[in-house]
Design a protein with these regions (language model features):
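The repeat-register position in solenoid repeat domains
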Residues: 249, 266-267, 279, 285, ...
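N-terminal glycine-rich phosphate-binding loop and ensuing alpha1 helix
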Residues: 1-61, 81
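Conserved beta-loop-beta/alpha segment of the NTase-like Rossmann-fold superfamily
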Residues: 60-62, 66-141
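Glycine-rich hexapeptide-repeat left-handed beta-helix
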Residues: 290-393
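Residues at the starts of beta-strands that form the adenosine-phosphate
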Residues: 2, 47-49, 72, 120-121, ...
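Extended, small-residue-rich solenoid/repeat segments and analogous flexible loops
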Residues: 180-183, 192-279
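Catalytic-core segments of class I nucleotidyltransferases/pyrophosphorylases
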Residues: 100, 117, 140-225
């Protein structure tokens, strides 16, 4: 079965992290988000991966190439992001039999994807506490009978998780009309399949739709926690490592460092003397942590630097971010309420009591900068030495 991965979207809700790469290519543990989905599809038996690309599509092509894990890779271009059915329709020429459709910005438990492929036609569902914000599946005797978008009175608590195994006939049903929000929806294709076939619901044990920065942090918490410990890099005998810690070849850990996993140090990463790194944390390729720095539950992307005597917690730093010496990130409110974050101009609760900052590629702080919880630094943003920043910039 071919697996079609949807990776064309820009990911405006996760900006500034998606300013130069599509959301499915943001780092989750040791690979891009979309690679986890591709891995699950291949493990389930996919004999070809078809990647639908659009925004910054060359980033996707550079990573996956023409073959991934021994499986052929093809590409389809979605010229304008006008819905999920439109995205799959862009890959129509690659469809010659039953096919799976997976969102490239979702994490699925791999065992469920395996069951999805075996049960075709089928759709993955997740049990949620409040299904009113999702497409909700109705079922009878183990068969899906309907799907309703964001109902006021949900018939079940089964949310559509955006993973489908379709029969070959569905290729001819992709040209659905635009919905009320102006998009061609893959759920309309699912409705047609439900009318013609017995569709099996596959309940996910775990699922994460990564749409906003704190969900990317959660994705890393999930996947870093699954890594098998190994030490391939240079670790000082005077360093202390415990728990699930991965030090890739080319990474360096200096004397006096304390690392409490789960932590991943990518190739070329350096952790300076007397630093403290706690899970779940990813230190990306070529990223560096200076003398006496504390990093907790954060993602430092490729080439990021946190200089001496700084503290970073529950944060995401884009590529080549540079935090000057003594930069301090606050990650908790005094009233212990959930931290809020601005998404597309709207202040939203993250649902987390601890959340620090999100810094776009190339952002820089002056020495002794203080950053308040839930702060966003745009691509290339700067701060002055000694500044306290309590508004996005």
């Amino acid at each position: 079965m071919k697996a079609i991965l949807l990776t064309a979207g820009e990911g405006t809700r996760i900006r500034p992290l998606s300013a130069s790469r599509p959301k499915p290519m943001l780092p989750v543990a040791d690979r891009p988000l979309a690679a986890h989905t591709a891995d699950a599809a291949i493990d389930a038996g996919a004999d070809e991966i078809v990647l639908v690309v659009g925004y910054e599509g060359e980033t996707v092509r550079e990573y996956f190439g023409e073959e991934y894990r021994g499986v052929p890779v093809s590409y389809a271009v979605q010229e304008a992001q006008t819905g999920t059915a439109d995205a799959v329709d862009a890959a129509r020429e690659h469809i010659d039999g039953p096919f799976a459709v997976l969102n490239g910005d979702n994490l699925y438990d791999p065992a469920a994807i395996d069951r999805l492929f075996d049960a075709c036609p089928a759709v993955c569902a997740a049990e949620v506490s409040d299904p009113r914000n999702y497409g909700v599946l109705s079922t009878t005797d183990g068969t899906v009978t309907d799907i309703v978008e964001k109902p006021d009175d949900p018939p079940t608590n089964l949310a559509n998780a955006g993973a489908y195994a379709f029969p070959a006939d569905a290729r001819e049903w992709l040209e659905v009309p635009a919905s009320e929000r102006g998009e061609r929806e893959i759920t309309d294709v699912l409705t047609r399949v439900i009318e013609q076939y017995s569709v099996t619901p596959i309940t996910l044990d775990r699922w994460l739709d990564v749409g906003r920065p704190w969900e990317l942090l959660e994705a890393n918490e999930w996947k870093v926690g699954e890594l098998e410990p190994r030490i391939d890099g240079a670790v000082s005998d005077a360093a202390h490592l415990e728990g699930r810690v991965v030090v890739e070849a080319g990474a360096t850990v200096d004397p006096g460092v304390v690392i409490e996993g789960p932590v991943l140090l990518r190739s070329g990463a350096t952790v300076g003397p007397n630093a403290s790194v706690r899970g779940a944390t990813v230190i990306g390729e070529g990223a560096s942590i200076g003398n006496g720095v504390e990093v907790k539950n954060s993602v430092l992307s490729r080439g990021a630097s946190v200089n001496h005597l700084s503290a970073v917690a529950d944060s995401i730093l884009g590529r080549n971010v540079n935090f000057g010496a003594g930069t301090t990130v606050a990650n908790r409110r005094h009233d212990d309420a959930d931290v809020s974050f601005t998404v597309k101009g709207e202040r939203l609760s993250t649902g987390r009591r601890t959340f620090g900052v999100v810094a776009g590629d190339g952002a820089k702080t002056g020495i002794n900068t203080s950053l308040t919880p839930g702060l966003k630094l745009a691509t290339g943003a700067t701060t002055a030495p000694g500044e306290t920043v309590d508004r996005d910039r």
